[in-house]
Amino acid sequence: MVRLQKAVMAVGMFSIFEAILQDRLGSANGFEKAKHILKDSSNFSLLQKLEDYKNAINALKHGKGRSYEYLVGRQPNLDFRIKLPHEIHFNEGDVSEVTILVDVDDNFVMGCARVIEEVSSVLRTEQPHILI
């Protein structure tokens, strides 16, 4: 149950952040607009982290698909664990584990929060007229 609660929290955080980006950046796709701002300001490392976490959230919401395949290709470079196609469990015998493709532990939830805060900070610097 704890892992499921963490997954719901992470998905909720990113969903609310996306809604805020859409509203404040005046864009139907807030993440794309934010990614352009990160790229234009040469924040490539943060851009990559945003893309990784955005795809992880999509894999949590939708299961296997493009976002999951993206994560499988990036697996050695991710800040969090994903369940690889040949894996059944993250930790066999862990009764708190739920059937999801991303290991949503404290590290993952805090990573989501850090990415949101860091992206917000860059947006406030690059677009000072926007309140995020």
Regions found by a protein language model. Name each.
Residues 44-72:
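Histidine-centered, metal-coordinating catalytic motifs and their short helical/loop contexts
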Residues 16, 49-52, 59, 111-114, ...:
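Charged, amphipathic alpha-helical oligomerization/scaffolding segments
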Residues 1-2, 27-30, 37, 89, ...:
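Residue-level signal for well-ordered alpha-helical segments
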Residues 66, 70-132:
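Polyanionic, low-complexity intrinsically disordered segments
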Residues 22-37, 67-74:
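Short acidic alpha-helical/loop segments enriched in Asp/Glu that coordinate divalent cations
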